[in-house]
Amino acid sequence: EAESFDKKGGWVLDNQSMGQMGSPYLLAHGLGVPVENASTVIQVRKAGKYRVWVRTRDWVKQWNKTGSPGRFEVLFNGKALDATFGTEKASWHWQDGGTIMLKVGDNRLELQDLTGFDGRCDAIFLSSELDLFPPDEGKLLAVFRREMLGLPVEPEDGGEYDLVVIGGGIAGCCAALRAARL
């Protein structure tokens, strides 16, 4: 999941599609100036050839406009993949990034914004099964994500509460303070 990158750089966490996807994504909102790279280090257990899939979307395709203002690249160990992402479909989908050779151990992964105009990256999936195509829609995607992330089928019971405050914005802080005084 892109939101778990160690360093977000100039990319920001956007949660507007949580209902569709079940998680937030990284957004490169630079007002026309490319933002600083997001980066993380991944551990590869077995050296070899991997297919790279990037879950993204071209946010202007829905209006049948030409060009893709939210373009970005994915770099492994400082080298960009041949594909440019955020250029194919209006809906969230897995865009094929081609194949790459990876070494055992630490490998640096980066998102490089090319435009500063809202590139979107939800997740990156690597597979040594070069013909594997990750699911794009609904329940199949939810099951795939849960299995890849090692999450349980049913969430752990967190107990019973009178009030749960989600978010630390002004409204969330006010609600938490008021609840603490009751």
Give short role names for the model-derived ranges.
Residues A176-L177:
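Generic hydrophobic/aromatic pocket-lining and core-packing "Φ" positions
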Residues D157-A171:
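Beta1/beta-strand and adjacent pyrophosphate-binding region of the FAD-binding site
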Residues E1-P155:
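Extracytoplasmic
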Residues A180-L182:
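Glycine-rich FAD pyrophosphate-binding loop
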